[in-house]
Regions:
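Terminal amphipathic alpha-helical/low-complexity segments used for targeting or macromolecular assembly
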Residues: 1-54, 58, 132, 172-183
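Short conserved AdoMet
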Residues: 57, 146, 164
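Beta-rich strand-turn-strand
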Residues: 137-161
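Acidic, glycine-centered active-site loop in nucleotide-sugar glycosyltransferases
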Residues: 165, 170-173
Length: 183
């Protein structure tokens, strides 16, 4: 039997409403935030995120250059941060815990395609970043991953499996480097 991928018959499972909200968001966010310096305008940015359904704490920090696919699937708790140029591809929910930081250029990816399906159907699973965790610059966090409390994902690491609390991981694929100890 010949194996064959048939994306010509792929069907987008996202609703028309979802697509329209995405279109409006794609226009609104850059227009509402392009003129703001990085350190200013946080209440304004939070307001826009909330208008599009995000659950975001008063002290959460989102840089204007952060890309958020679907605000209604974003929850940010107290003192959490999405830094500059973060790409939050949140087709499924992304939850960022208190005092957690996602550093510049990191990629949070809640969706992929089923490579065993000839139609490559979309598959999704949430990402949870627990309290006091840190995602390093340009790191990749894949769908379905939970980053434990206090864990650190090193710069440019690629995480495909859950990371235990108070653990430092790095590399591709990410491997445990050591336990994180706060002095």
């Amino acid at each position: 039997m010949e194996q064959r991928v048939d994306i010509a018959h792929y069907h987008n499972v996202l609703s028309r409403k979802h697509q329209i909200i995405r279109l409006l968001w794609g226009i609104a966010w850059p227009m509402a935030t392009w003129f703001l310096p990085r350190s200013m305008g946080m209440p304004w940015k939070r307001m826009w995120l909330r208008l599009f359904g995000a659950r975001i704490a008063k002290t959460a920090n989102v840089y204007a250059s952060a890309k958020i696919y679907y605000p209604a699937n974003l929850e940010m708790k107290e003192y959490s941060c999405l830094a500059s140029d973060v790409d939050c591809y949140n087709v499924a929910p992304v939850i960022i815990g208190e005092q957690s930081t996602v550093s510049q250029g990191a990629y949070l990816c809640t969706a992929s395609h089923d490579i065993t399906d000839p139609l490559n159907h979309l598959i999704t699973s949430p990402i949870v970043i627990e309290d006091q965790a840190w995602i390093g610059a340009k790191a990749f966090v894949g769908m379905g991953v939970t980053i434990g409390q206090g864990a650190v994902v090193g710069a440019t690491a690629s995480v495909y499996k859950n990371v235990e609390s108070w653990t430092v991981v790095g590399g591709n694929p990410a491997k445990v480097i050591k336990k994180r100890v706060i002095n």
